[in-house]
Amino acid sequence: MTAPLSLFVTGTDTEIGKTFVSAAMLHGFARHGLRAAALKPVAAGAYERDGVWRNEDADQLDAAANVVLPPELRTPFLLKAPAAPHIVAAQEGVTLDIDTIVACHREALTRADVVVVEGVGGFRVPLTDTQDTADLAVALGLPVVLVVGVRLGCISHALLTADAIRQRGLTLAGWVANHVDPAMSYADENVATIRDWLAREHGAPLLGRIPHMSPAAAESAAAMLDIAALVETLRAAQH
């Protein structure tokens, strides 16, 4: 029996399409014949419907997954205000506990062939006074996929984030170029620069390039990702 696969999705910033790309990967894994589930361990920003608190990002992931986890397993920490998690958690009297997230991830692996874990914000977003999302990625011990929001400044953001991932002893399994600014000048040149630098310095391939979509369509974006290459990388990372 093949061991389940998993990856941690981070981004160069907030609002650059991590959830969109994570949903696209879930569709891609499903097309690859895998049972795909999502974890959004920490979500900041909730709305109430039918007496239940929900999160839009988590809803998008559920819509894309072909294995839908119970809400308390998929998102053990759902914060109401859409702001920095450690600030909101303190105000709401919640402790964002990494061990709890690791336990949820362990359980999720028993229910799917692949589990996509989406972080919150960028790679180093504080969860407590002493721990951040980089510590979470280390605790999970997962290969990382970096979503680069292609806009002015993305080259430095991508290279800095890749360096931070390596400094934590984690594998950068690849990256996705997600075009968030349709009016950006020299977009092709920016993507080419990031591709060359990340390949040379980290051996990290470009897994796909997604044009600006309005509205965003994760199912269509899935066809733009090299899921076969990603699966191969994730399997190699297990050995």
From Swiss-Prot:
This is ATP-dependent dethiobiotin synthetase BioD. The active site is at K40. The keyword Nucleotide-binding applies. It is found in: Cytoplasm. InterPro entries: DTB_synth_BioD, P-loop_NTPase. Gene3D superfamilies: P-loop containing nucleotide triphosphate hydrolases. It is an enzyme of class 6 (ligase). It holds the Pfam family AAA_26.
